């Protein structure tokens, strides 16, 4: 049982690492520009800090098992889909010029904390918040991806710490496959998603998540 748990955790780490590298590769220009743009770096830190603090608290208090209740997943999926729909209706008021305000960064960071609730999409809730604040869909998505870098990095490091003592060398090939698959899929997903939101609304994602949420409720009812 413990061995299976370690295998799953290792595979999740490989997948997280692949996603992390994909975001870094795709946004390498923005990342390198941070060297000359301290305000952007500051805002990324501000937006990331809340989820790190609350994530640590959830782990210490051991309430993550309670949050994994499938009913919570279903209701969160439906509820935050509705939030995304209405937030996406807000007109663009703010131009993201690589220097959003600290207050807006904090709001988006607090919204990201809600992603700790299973069924809540991290990108979905942060984009919802950014759209509500008046950012365009494309700018909202870009900032959401940028603040995912510290989060993915932290998740990877914590995961490695948990399985380091029980690492199985026989799983290296499987982990490389998982990493490579995650990297390729993530790169394609980022490119397709950003191209889509630049020209279209987020309604299709709302519909997909609503369907998934109601399917889960239907499954529970039967």
Which residue stretches match the model-derived regions?
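Multi-pass membrane proteins that catalyze or facilitate reactions on polyprenyl-/lipid-phosphate substrates
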Residues: 1-222
């Amino acid at each position: 049982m413990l061995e299976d748990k370690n295998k799953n955790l290792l595979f999740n780490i490989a997948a997280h690492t692949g996603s992390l590298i994909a975001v870094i590769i795709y946004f390498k220009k923005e990342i390198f520009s941070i060297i000359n743009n301290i305000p952007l770096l500051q805002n990324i830190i501000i937006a990331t800090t809340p989820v790190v603090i609350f994530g640590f608290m959830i782990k210490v208090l051991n309430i993550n098992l309670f949050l994994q209740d499938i009913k919570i997943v279903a209701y969160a999926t439906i509820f935050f889909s509705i939030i995304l729909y209405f937030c996406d209706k807000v007109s663009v008021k703010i131009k993201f010029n690589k220097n959003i305000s600290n207050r807006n960064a904090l709001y988006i960071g607090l919204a990201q904390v809600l992603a700790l609730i299973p069924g809540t999409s991290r990108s979905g809730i942060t984009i919802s918040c950014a759209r509500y604040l008046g950012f365009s869909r494309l700018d909202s998505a870009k900032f959401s991806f940028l603040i995912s870098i510290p989060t993915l990095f932290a998740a990877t490091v914590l995961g490695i710490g948990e399985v380091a003592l029980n690492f199985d060398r026989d799983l290296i090939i499987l982990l490389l496959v998982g990493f490579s698959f995650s990297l390729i899929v993530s790169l394609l997903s980022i490119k397709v998603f950003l191209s889509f939101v630049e020209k279209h609304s987020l309604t299709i994602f709302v519909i997909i998540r609503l369907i998934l949420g109601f399917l889960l409720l239907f499954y529970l009812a039967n």
